[in-house]
């Protein structure tokens, strides 16, 4: 039986509370981060566009925590595979557009030096016990990812397919804001100790570039880079995105709109996970036993004597 906990967001505490912060405190932190971008800049606009979806993401993350994100390897690794699929699609398109078409935005994004897909792959190989022996391992990795995607929701599949078909740096910037930003700006670094406790240090390659000294500088560089993406066209009063077929979209607006859609896509990936944690059967058994005892106690005395 599949757990419905991953979609019943009203049945569990908010993610903010699970981390020791109220939803209001989390909102204040989000707003404080937003203000680190330039006034009327792209970073602030992207943050504002995902505000509501980010609140939903916190709640969904809380559901995943309750469902076993940091207590059951099977739950964690399925989440990792889904986000790997999206991230790998994005980074593959970035490299292709930079190399084949000289896309300036992709060039700027890649200049940050991040490539999370290979790190995801190392962790997936560890989490699924895939021997690192070259081509056979890569084939096993591909098969493992395909199996997870096969049982994912239609929304998750559609989100990944959308990224695979992105044709401009403006679209990929919106995806990067959500998929990279969650690790660089968000709680990636804070998740590492819990992941290491559950899965071991060999499953923590994903956090290599977002932990350790220089975290504040990495955040600042990410924010400044986003604010710079459309600054030239803004200064020149030429906002039309010539990378798009319609010729009418503004790069600034296109990135913000794509960012908003990708945040919803990230949430779709989280709702796609439906694995029961290993400990659920024990919780259920205990609950059933408790209910049975309570029910027996409240039976009329005559009925209790006959049982």
Segments from the language model and where they lie:
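Metal- and O2-centered redox machinery and metal/ROS homeostasis
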Residues: 2-307
């Amino acid at each position: 039986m599949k757990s419905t906990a991953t979609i019943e967001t009203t049945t569990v505490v908010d993610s903010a509370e699970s981390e020791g912060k109220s939803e209001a405190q989390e909102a204040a932190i989000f707003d404080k981060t937003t203000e680190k971008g330039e006034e009327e800049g792209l970073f602030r606009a992207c943050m504002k566009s995902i505000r509501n979806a980010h609140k939903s993401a916190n709640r969904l993350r809380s559901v995943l925590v309750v469902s076993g994100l940091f207590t059951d390897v099977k739950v964690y690794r399925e989440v990792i595979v889904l986000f790997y699929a999206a991230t790998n699609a994005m980074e593959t398109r970035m490299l292709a557009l930079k190399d084949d078409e000289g896309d300036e935005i992709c060039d700027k994004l890649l200049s940050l030096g991040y490539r999370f897909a290979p790190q995801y792959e190392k962790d997936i190989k560890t989490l699924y016990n895939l021997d690192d022996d070259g081509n056979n391992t890569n084939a096993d990795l591909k098969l493992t990812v395909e199996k997870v995607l096969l049982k994912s929701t239609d929304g998750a599949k559609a989100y990944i397919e959308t990224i695979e078909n992105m044709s401009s740096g403006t679209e990929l910037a919106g995806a990067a804001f959500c998929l990279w930003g969650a690790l660089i700006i968000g709680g990636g670094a804070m998740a590492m100790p819990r992941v290491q406790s559950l899965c071991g240090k060999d499953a923590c390659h994903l956090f290599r570039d977002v932990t350790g000294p220089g975290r504040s500088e990495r955040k600042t560089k990410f924010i400044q880079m986003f604010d710079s993406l459309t600054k030239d066209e803004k200064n020149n009063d030429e906002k039309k995105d010539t990378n798009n077929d319609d010729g009418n979209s503004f790069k600034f607006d296109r990135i913000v709109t794509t960012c908003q859609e990708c945040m919803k896509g990230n949430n779709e990936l989280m709702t796609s996970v439906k694995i029961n944690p290993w400990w659920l059967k024990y919780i259920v058994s205990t609950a059933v036993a408790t209910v049975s005892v309570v029910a027996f106690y409240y039976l009329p005395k005559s009925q209790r004597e006959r049982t």
